[in-house]
A protein has these predicted regions:
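Gram-negative bacterial Sec-dependent N-terminal signal peptides
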Residues: 2-19
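Metal-dependent amide/peptide-bond hydrolase catalytic core
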Residues: 21-141
Length: 141
């Protein structure tokens, strides 16, 4: 048997087993200005941007054998606009070339999701709110 055995538990009872020679786990961190829901209404929301990014990832890489998103977290309260959002993306590929393509798809999807949240809130790069950047930003490690 060549490669690694990757087991991804999806949902409560479903399981998917994939063969992969190359695997990688990316951490996506999304940051925004956050704020209290009353005084900062209309600010960009890092959790909303994260969900938009995940929807774009699922469109770009529909195979659960190649891509699994997990561990989403963010925000601090039900009545606060989330200043942060985080999730993991597990990728499985047959070789380094395919892995590079998958990583590019994740990068493009996250950018598209973040850009959509910024556009929805009509935020421009460099704009400030409460002395901090108004736009949602992201890093992928």
């Amino acid at each position: 048997m060549k490669g690694k055995l990757i087991v991804a538990l999806l949902g409560s009872f479903a399981a998917s087993v994939a063969m992969a020679d190359v695997s990688s786990v990316l951490t996506v961190d999304i940051q925004g200005p956050g704020g209290h829901s009353n005084g900062a209404y209309g600010n960009t929301n890092a959790v909303h941007a994260g969900v938009r990014a995940i929807m774009e990832i699922e469109k770009a890489i529909p195979s659960q054998k190649q891509c699994v998103v997990s561990g989403f977290s963010g925000g601090v309260s039900v009545n606060a606009i989330a200043a942060d959002g985080h999730f993991k993306v597990s990728l499985n590929a047959k070789d380094e070339k395919e892995m590079a393509q998958l990583k590019q798809k994740v990068e493009a999807a996250v950018k598209k999701g973040v850009d959509a949240e910024n556009a929805f809130r009509s935020v421009k790069p460099g704009q400030l709110t409460g002395g901090v950047p108004a736009e949602v930003r992201y890093t992928i490690k």
